[in-house]
A protein has these predicted regions:
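C-terminal catalytic/motor cores of large multi-domain enzyme assemblies
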Residues: 5-8, 12-179
C-alpha cells in the first residue's frame, strides 16, 4: 500500500473506532437466540483485501488503543499476508465491524453485505472532486461515497443515518480523532 493510502485507511479506521464507542449498537452482535444484543467492550475492525483468490478480511484488534502509526504498520502487514496467502485463521476472526473499500477500483457506490455476527459494514468508494453549492456559487469539494449496510434487528435507519453523518463529520475534520 502507498503511504498516502495507508494514512487514509488509518484515519478512516480510527474514525470508525471512535464511532463504535460513541454509538455502541454498531459495536455489537445479536445473540444466537436472536433475543439479546451483545455489546462488545473491544473495538476490532476487519478490512477487505482484494487478492487473486478473492476478498479476505483480516482483523485489526483493539483499533481504539493504537496510534495511527501502529494502525498503518499493522494494516500493511496484514494486507501483505492476505495477498501472499500467509494470513492465519486467528488474524481473520473477532471483528466487530468491517470496512470494504473499492475506491482503488473505482465506481461510485456498492452495497456491502453484513458479515454475521457483526451488525454493520461500511462500504467506501472512490473519492472525487464534485461541485457543491455553498449558497452563492458552486465550490469544488472532495466527496467520499459511503455505503452502510446494517442488520435492522439491531440498528434502525435513523441510527444508521446518524452514523454516516457523524463519520462524514469526523473525516472532514480529523482533529477529534487525533486527540
Amino acid at each position: 500500500l502507498s503511504l498516502r493510502r495507508q494514512r487514509q485507511m488509518c484515519i478512516r479506521d480510527r474514525s470508525c473506532a471512535h464511532l463504535l464507542k460513541e454509538l455502541p449498537d454498531f459495536n455489537s452482535s445479536l445473540a444466537p437466540s436472536g433475543k439479546a444484543i451483545i455489546r462488545k467492550k473491544y473495538v476490532n475492525i476487519g478490512f477487505a483485501v482484494d487478492t487473486p483468490d478473492g476478498l479476505l478480511v483480516p482483523v485489526i484488534k483493539n483499533v481504539d488503543q493504537k496510534s495511527l502509526l501502529q494502525l498503518a504498520a499493522e494494516a500493511a502487514s496484514l494486507a501483505e499476508k492476505a495477498r501472499t496467502k500467509k494470513l492465519s485463521a486467528d488474524e481473520m476472526q473477532g471483528a466487530c465491524f468491517t470496512i470494504s473499500s473499492l475506491g482503488h477500483i473505482g465506481g461510485t457506490g456498492f452495497t456491502p453485505i453484513v458479515n454475521a455476527p457483526e451488525v454493520a459494514i461500511l462500504g467506501v468508494s472512490k473519492a472525487t472532486i464534485q461541485p457543491v453549492w455553498d449558497g452563492k456559487a458552486f465550490q469544488p469539494k472532495l466527496m467520499l461515497p459511503l455505503s452502510l449496510s446494517y442488520d435492522h434487528r439491531v440498528i434502525n435507519g435513523a441510527a444508521a443515518a446518524r452514523f454516516t453523518k457523524r463519520l462524514s463529520d469526523l473525516l472532514a475534520d480529523i482533529r477529534t480523532i487525533l486527540l
